[in-house]
Amino acid sequence: MSRSETLFSNAQKHIPGGVNSPVRAFKSVGGTPLFFKHAEGAYVLDEDDKRYVDYVGSWGPMILGHSHPDVLDAVRRQLDHGLSYGAPTALEVEMADLVCAMVPSMEMVRMVSSGTEATMSAIRLARGYTGRDSIIKFEGCYHGHSDSLLVKAGSGALTFGVPNSPGVPAAFAKHTLTLPFNDIEAVRETLAEVGTDVACIIVEPVAGNMNCVPPAPGFLEGLREACDEHGVVLIFDEVMTGFRVALGGAQAYYGVTPDLSTFGKIIGGGMPVGAFGGKREIMQQISPLGPVYQAGTLSGNPLAMAAGLTTLRLISRPGFHDELGAYTTRMLEGLQQRADAAGIPFVTTQAGGMFGLYFTDAEAIVTFEDVMTSDVERFKRFFHLMLDGGVYLAPSAFEAGFTSIAHGDRELEITLNAAEKAFAALK
């Protein structure tokens, strides 16, 4: 029995399902989840000392690669001064200044401890600002596990085939309108009918929780116009895309400015963190300036701020995101060539250093329905074949993959060699 098998068996005694986040359980791909003990650069090392090229990257934060020495040094320096104060620090002021400089739509920002907190708080703020109750989200998009957002959500809920979670009261769900992603006409029609009741539209500008679905041309622009017309707050959930698809996030990449944005992952350099912010007139409604309450014991945690500040400064160097995107493109082109040679229906998507893999003969991946044409059983086999070849992909057919600046020629060679064998075995 492997160490991972032993640990997973032991974990199930006191941890529900043996994991602390559902997708880690390998339920959607089968087999025993890997337990990792070390990560460095583009690699993770499991408890049985097998090394893998990592395309999960802790689900996005590790854009520099794992254990970047400058980030570790920043955390060590802060450790000498304490773990948490529950009081303001200079680091959180530096972080706020840096985020607002990098993302022009951010006039004010509030730090929290997770992406779920960020989206939950942004929606509460939008409701408080507008005095309206309803929100619009999109089919297949995931914005964390708060009650009002677990309605036809993607990601873990999609993987398990549960459209909404037990424990979410119908009274919460009724205020959440779920529309098709990339369908701007559905948005216009809905707002024409109930726009005066809608506080906000929240959207992943690149839907990273039904694998990786970029916005259709005109979709984000259409959302901006529709929100302006009906006095609706536009929220971009950039927990995944923020600082990854471009330094200024997807809003800079696609040239569309939201009213509020949410961030996580990269902003903490691998530490637990989240943030939300945007227009000053909206953010001034947050306590203690305004009546909308939001608080957190660990918000602005100095360790997370130290790691995040160092990460953001390192990714600010000229050419960083071009290099990240170029590697991702080379890798996806190599996968496509090998799938085509093996006669395997296969489609890839990309937004900077973020990508999606679909076993489908669909011409393009644009909608939730396109995503659902993907052959999940074939992905399961591909996942394990790649794992055997030393490549760790997201253990779900509905999760985005991520590259880091630490991925280079050697990692590309390992990945494509493993893929060539995997596609051949899938015939």
Curated annotation (Swiss-Prot):
GO CC, alphabetical: cytoplasm
UniProt enzyme class: isomerase
Signal peptide: none
Alphabetical list of PROSITE patterns matching this protein: AA_TRANSFER_CLASS_3
GO molecular function: glutamate-1-semialdehyde 2,1-aminomutase activity; pyridoxal phosphate binding; transaminase activity
Primary location: cytoplasm
Matches recorded under CDD domains: OAT_like
Residues with the N6-(pyridoxal phosphate)lysine modification: K265
Annotated keywords: Cytoplasm, Isomerase, Porphyrin biosynthesis, Pyridoxal phosphate
Gene Ontology biological-process entries: protoporphyrinogen IX biosynthetic process
Organism: Pseudomonas paraeruginosa (strain DSM 24068 / PA7)
Cofactor(s) needed for function: pyridoxal 5'-phosphate
Entry keyword annotation includes Cytoplasm: yes
Pfam family, one: Aminotran_3
Reaction it catalyzes: (S)-4-amino-5-oxopentanoate = 5-aminolevulinate
EC numbers on record: 5.4.3.8
Subcellular location: Cytoplasm
Record InterPro entries: 4pyrrol_synth_GluAld_NH2Trfase, Aminotrans_3, Aminotrans_3_PPA_site, PyrdxlP-dep_Trfase, PyrdxlP-dep_Trfase_major, PyrdxlP-dep_Trfase_small
Protein name according to UniProt: Glutamate-1-semialdehyde 2,1-aminomutase
Pathway annotation from the record: Porphyrin-containing compound metabolism; protoporphyrin-IX biosynthesis; 5-aminolevulinate from L-glutamyl-tRNA(Glu): step 2/2
Protein encoded by which gene: hemL
UniProt similarity note: Belongs to the class-III pyridoxal-phosphate-dependent aminotransferase family. HemL subfamily.
Quaternary structure, from the entry: Homodimer.
